[in-house]
Every structure is written in structure tokens, then in C-alpha cells.
């Protein structure tokens, strides 16, 4: 089983298509289809299952996924609305959720690939390399992604 969070989004659905092209049909898409038209990105793709992100998180924390043979997690899911002003929601959805997924993967030695964001560099006046001097998030979305990047660096300092 391969998990793709944010699998109904633009990047996630293209990732699912690429996995399908490589013969992977055991893809579970985790997303939040609040926008009714978002499902269109998944049409024509081989998806073994769809899980709502909240249901999935509840199942993950409850142990329902402990016996599932997950081979990889591609974490593309996030609230990417740069105008979102609810900081608690953004931290819960983008930072805490990401930490939960990361620890699930680490505890089971599952490869975990996640998407950060160029927004952690602000306007980019300081450059776009992973150097704390260059990172200057300008909104709560960018800050939530930045915090997870920092968390990963502290937890896995040699990971690339």
C-alpha cells in the first residue's frame, strides 16, 4: 500500500498518475474533498481507497493502520491557502498532522517523502537554499511549513 496525502490536489493527483504509470495500483488517497470539484483530479486514476483526512488521522491514532503493509508515504497534503487567518487550524492541519504522519512512518521504517514550500523563503530576497538565514515566512501557511521543516531537521539532522 502506498499512501498519498493531498492526493486529490494538483501535485498529489499527478503523483498518483505517475505511480499508476509505474504499475502501482495499491494507492490510498488521503484528502479533504470540501470542494466538490476536486475529485475530478482523480478521474481515470487507479486508486485502491480514499480516506478523508480527519477519518484517516483518527484511524492512524487509533491503531487501525498498524497492521497495514504501507510501503511508502508521500505527504503532499496541507491547507495551502495563504490567506487563511486561523493560525490554530493551520498549525493543526499542516504542522501537527505532518508530525503524526512522520512518526508513524519512522516507527515502522516506512519511507516518508513530504512537500515543503518555497513560501518558507518569503520573497526570496535572501536566496532559496536550506539555510536558516534565507528562511523568512510571511504568512501562517509558510510558517506552518517552516516549523515542520525545522522539526524534521532537528529530529533527523542527517536526512536529505
Per-range role (PLM):
Residues 28-56:
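Glycine-rich phosphate-binding loop and adjoining beta1-alpha1-beta2 segment
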Residues 92, 96-100, 107, 111, ...:
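Catalytic helix-loop patch of NAD(P)-dependent Rossmann-fold dehydrogenases
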Residues 5, 30, 73-77, 112-118:
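SDR active-site strand-loop-helix element
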Residues 2-24:
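N-terminal Rossmann NAD(P)H-binding glycine-rich loop of SDR-like oxidoreductase domains
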Residues 44, 53-54, 58-93:
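NAD(P)H-binding glycine-rich loop region in Rossmannoid oxidoreductase-like domains
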Residues 15, 68-73, 85-113:
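NAD(P)-cofactor binding segment of oxidoreductase domains
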Amino acid at each position: 500500500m502506498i499512501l498519498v496525502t493531498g492526493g486529490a490536489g494538483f501535485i498529489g493527483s499527478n503523483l498518483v498518475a505517475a505511480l499508476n504509470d509505474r504499475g502501482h495500483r495499491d494507492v490510498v488517497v488521503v484528502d479533504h474533498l470540501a470542494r466538490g470539484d476536486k475529485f475530478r483530479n482523480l478521474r481515470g486514476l487507479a486508486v485502491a481507497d480514499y480516506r478523508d483526512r480527519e477519518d484517516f488521522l483518527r484511524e492512524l491514532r487509533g491503531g487501525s493502520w498498524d497492521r497495514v503493509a504501507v510501503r511508502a508515504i508521500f505527504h503532499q497534503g496541507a491547507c495551502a491557502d495563504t490567506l487563511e487567518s486561523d493560525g490554530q487550524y493551520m498549525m493543526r492541519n499542516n504542522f501537527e498532522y505532518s508530525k503524526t504522519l512522520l512518526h508513524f512512518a519512522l516507527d515502522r521504517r516506512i519511507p516518508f517523502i513530504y512537500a515543503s514550500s518555497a513560501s518558507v523563503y518569503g520573497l526570496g530576497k535572501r536566496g532559496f537554499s536550506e539555510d536558516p538565514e534565507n528562511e523568512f515566512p510571511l504568512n501562517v501557511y509558510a510558517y506552518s511549513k517552516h516549523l515542520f521543516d525545522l522539526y524534521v531537521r532537528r529530529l533527523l539532522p542527517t536526512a536529505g
